[in-house]
Amino acid sequence: MAYDHKAIEKKWQRYWKQHKTFKATLDKDQKKYYALDMFPYPSGQGLHVGHPEGYTATDVMSRLKRMQGFNVLHPMGWDAFGLPAEQYALKTGHNPADFTNQNVDHFRDQIQSLGFSYDWDREVNTTDPNYYKWTQWIFEQLYKKGLAYEDEIMVNWAPDFMGGTVVANEEVVDGKTERGGYPVYRVPMRQWVLKITAYADRLIDDLDLVDWPESVKEMQRNWIGRSEGASVKFKVVGHDGVEIEVFTTRADTLFGASYVVLAPENELVDQLTTPEQKAAVDAYKEEVSRRSDLERTELSKEKTGVFTGAYVINPVNGEQLPIWTADYVLNSYGTGAVMAVPSGDQRDFEFATKFNLPITPVVEGFNGEEAYTEDGAHVNSGFLDGLNIKEAKAKMVEWLEEHDCGGKKVNYRLRDWIFSRQRYWGEPIPVIHWDDGTTSLVPEDELPLRLPETDNIEPSGTGESPLANIEDWVNVYDENGRHGKRETNTMPQWAGSSWYWLRYTDPTNDKEFASKEALDYWSPVDLYVGGAEHAVLHLLYARFWHKVLYDLGLVPTKEPFMKLVNQGMILGSNHEKMSKSKGNVVNPDDIVDQYGADTLRLYEMFMGPLEESVPWDEKGLHGSNKWVQRVWRLLMDDNNHLRDRVSTYNDGKLTKVYNQTVKKVTDDFERMHFNTAISQLMVFVNEAYKVDDLPLEYMKGFVKMIAPLMPHLAEELWSQFNESETITYQPWPTYDEKALVEDEVEMIVQVNGKVRAKIKMAKDADNKDVEDAALANEHVHSFVDGKDVKKVIVIPNRIVNIVVK
């Protein structure tokens, strides 16, 4: 009979749940392995077939490691705060908590139907007050360390969108919201900010400690954007004591500076603009306020700007340079000011060309048609003339330091992390602002500061979060009657995901976020699998929080995740990204119902290398299901009993291929090359179908090897061997090195250099025996009969060349 996936999968999922088969307990005598998935946001759409790919990969590794004797921690949880739930609630009038819990239940059911070996007793949910109590507690440690502060930050304010709200840079297109097309303005707003820049160097340097894809490391290095250069101070003409400081990586080009640019938001713009230019500058600032940072810094964008009417003195040659304001300079980068050298920077060149500003060549090679950025001898550069870039940089930095108008400096592209959102559905920030101007933290023994339940989650319209509407929650009094207001901004969705792997080690602890004992034993995460879209922000924020906790002596390792793997994307069958709008989304529930979870798991691991993006293919899925059935039929007869040919008798016919399979599958699983491991398992099954007797020892080993991939099928087959215990903790099969030795080789036989036959010989056979066998071969006869054999050349184990005349 065919394999009944529905009955068998339900049976074993029930068994695992009842027996808590995958429960992890701290055992210091056992070596540990911590396999972690990036926990999902439980959306209303539920799982799609892209989710199980990464989850199956970590599950294969978790099941392998258990069988190899490791104590495995393999947990799952929910990154459940987030904007979609709030937007859904606004649209429908439902409570975002109810909507989120309903989605979590649906996700959990879907994930459990796929047979993943999670320890569900460790499940976490970022919206659970018992969880976010510790998110708030960590925020308080950041605050005490001076790493959390308030600042006026330029934000994208859309007064007409959702009743007035802040939108991210990525959500602004042509000065309007991406959704709805509402006008967006750049306005300053009070925000909480985390000082991630204090860790910039360590976030770069410690990438050397982890086994991550080089592409991800490079993306993080570029995001942090450490650049070594110099600061240069320009005195402003007619303004005593006022200087404009710029950062440059090309101090050697200072002789070629022809103007200075201030970001429109730079406070010096209003201070320095002349009365004659004020109207033009104000109009320009208003225009720029409707552009996002992304739009402003597009390289292909038409350059815009306005002259302020003011000048600075170039310290190196005394020339007066005009001060312009232009949107391609961001106030959030460096000092919000740049020195412009049109002959050496393409943006400066385009700007100078448009506004007819001087362009002075300072390095040989400039052709007047575009900026020259290659190396060369300096010209028009006084004491730098004739030097190359490296020499000239060093000499100019020396000169700046000697003359007290600048010096060596390191700059970072990384900005501090804006940590507040004007939203309801997030962790409340545990801060009180008192009427006397002071700020205090909510006492630790009063945490969690719970998110108040309310029907009114409409935006406040003032830029504050909807929490500002809840008067009795916002207003507080201390024991002396002093009045204060709670912080109404909430934390971003990144907060809960910046430490969740630590909570999994001790998820029910109500005294601390996790005990030292649990953290010391389980840390760090050995394998972390998730999408490449999180290569920068989530991983950077998580590493930052981890390092802060390390500095506080609360975690034992400098880095949280030792090995990172990004699974590829599963595309639609048309090679496009799966999306509801394209109608190409495949629901895993349908696949599990029709073919079973083991088929889906097998197919997703067999599609191609784990890291590559591949299109969904129904034929491939069907082929995987056929192989599941083929494995079942190999061992089970039509009455669903173990076949008689499975016995303790071993005639040796499968010995070589079995040992080869154990070696290859073990090696490939360890390297997460699942597709090639499956190919080898298929080779073994093909060979097993060719022989009369199936040795019990080899069949047990084979079933163990398929267990990480197809656990339901493996458990059922294992039970058919009269085994009473789960296969989960059975020892992983080993191979015999001696059985892998090739005792026979295939040799090519050539006659006068042309291939005429192939012969099998014992490895390292005597040359005389090889000659005799070659000459005796029936395919060689016709080419040597009646001819004079001049000589026979034998290249051991490879070629026999017979020379005839």
Curated annotation (Swiss-Prot):
Coiled coil: none
Cellular compartments annotated: Cytoplasm
SUPFAM superfamilies, sorted: Anticodon-binding domain of a subclass of class I aminoacyl-tRNA synthetases, Nucleotidylyl transferase, ValRS/IleRS/LeuRS editing domain
Binding-site residues for ATP, renumbered to this chain: K580
One of the GO BP terms on file: leucyl-tRNA aminoacylation
Motif window: 'HIGH' region: 40-51
EC number: 6.1.1.4
One GO CC annotation: cytosol
Record family assignment: Belongs to the class-I aminoacyl-tRNA synthetase family.
Name of the molecule in the record: Leucine--tRNA ligase
